[in-house]
Amino acid sequence: MKRFGQYVCIVLLVAFGFGAEAQVATSVNPSGFGDRQFAMDTVFSNKRIREDDKMYQISVWRRIDLREKYNLSLYGSGDNKANGIVNHIYKAVVDDNALEVFADQNFTKPLSIAEFQENFWLSANGDSIFVKQLYYIDFKEDFVFDRHHSDLVFDIKFIELVMPSVTNANAGQKTIAYIRYKDFVNYFKNHPEARWLNFQNISKSLTYDQAFESRLFRSVVRRFTNPDEALIADMVRADNANPEMQAYLNGLAFEYKLLEFENALWEW
């Protein structure tokens, strides 16, 4: 009977131990014995934000124009821009076969290297172009309030290489390829030769993943979550005297709206 009592005590202690482990905060041990498993974007995002912790979220589509003074560190130096971000992305895809590229933003249509090269080098009339003529980099990100960390986060999802209409024989802009942002970060953090160039102090140049995570670029908002999935430019009235300028101003107003949201969040 005494031995039976000892067995009962051991069983109770073991059960209590597992129960205590099960109640450990999932933020401390998210993959342990927790009673909840949190969904998380591990395909596109470089940030570990649990879906259940997204208290507020809106998607934003932006464009970086590498010709702008603030973005010259990404554009590269010299006339051919061989040390710029566009050429380094090309090398990562073609020379190293390290970045998977897609034809659509749903990432359902992978591109072969040959298809990527054709999209990259040939304009609509079949003429070859130069790397420096590719100066648009678009990307999609989510503006998220992470309630677990009480933090507002810009969570980039993918990058889109775009051929400008002028480069594309004035036949309209062309999507060259889509790249997962997580793949982009994982590649360039291990390739320090590809750098955001600090022209004032070369020793403080950064890898592309550091530059993007530090938001060392200037971009304009082209689209945000809306019922019609319309670009900001498409929402400008047709009778506007200067629709391009109005679209730019509307994008800027949206930027200020995000800043105001962040400011108001902590006001109370």
For the regions a protein language model found, what residue spans apply to each?
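Extracytoplasmic
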Residues: 132-134, 154-156, 174-176
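Surface-exposed flexible segments
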Residues: 171-185
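Bacterial Sec-dependent N-terminal signal peptides
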Residues: 1-29
